[in-house]
């Protein structure tokens, strides 16, 4: 509960401006740093990111945590509260704001060029007014509201940040994002039966409940149409590798030229979580498209060598292909079809194809996908939404062909069917 003496905060009128920014330095000692509205480094966040780096967190994790802390700093600036003066009342209001308010509109990158540090100028861009479902794919598009997964991630990040500050003795005397009240009775899973699986227990008090999502695959006919619309051998090779290996997008984009072994049909990737190098089998056509792409780009003067990146931009100067550029390529390829599949859906598609192969065991699929638990791989054995819809429509069609059910004949001559219906409760 919030303190009785706290000042009322009108969240409906709270305007969160896009002040401050998260800067990627390229320095391995400090990959990311948070800058406030005046362009100064936020030291408490830098210390927290250094702690995460010491815990062997990847650069993408530091970037993800930094973005949530940037949103929190912007919200505190709008609320007029210092980061070390917050209470659970601010944590509660922040959770309510993320649940109800629209996302802060971000200015276009062209309008940010030449602006002072931490200050945005020019018009702002906002997403669609409401979540819409794509009529072709059935996937919901992002709206102006924060998703439940984004809110849950922000709650986890901020709770860990203030736990770190409490351990160092520099910060508020209590965490503004406390644990759920049920956790006060003892540790989690204290009385669990060892013969039963772990049950999900609520962690944070302001952590939202997330719906269980079933992975969505791209139907074969839509994948073929997207593949036919690609403009370059590089893009064809990328899609062929993504869908045949089941690798994550950035795992494949981080590969170097020495990671490819065409003779064995293997390509090495660095796993997202464990950072372990794993060789993955790929389809033969993926290596054909890769060779065509390499010969084409090498003739244009792209770097060639064992330790050079495998994927480059198609125009000079040749730079390593980054995830935003690959995502833009995949989005452009779907414009004519009107679909909104993501690159990660290619991983789901490859996993679904392997899991549905009767001659491939589920443990083999788990190894290829790099899942820590077999239960995660089992998600791909659930019926696909398109298959369930087709099966239900076929059921209705069969019932329509059979026509209305004929009334049973009377048990013997002389019985009135209406009287039998009244006696036995059947409709007349």
Question: Across the structure, where does each feature detected by a protein language model lie?
Answer:
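C-terminal secondary-structure termini that scaffold catalytic or DNA-interacting sites
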Residues: 3-6, 395-428
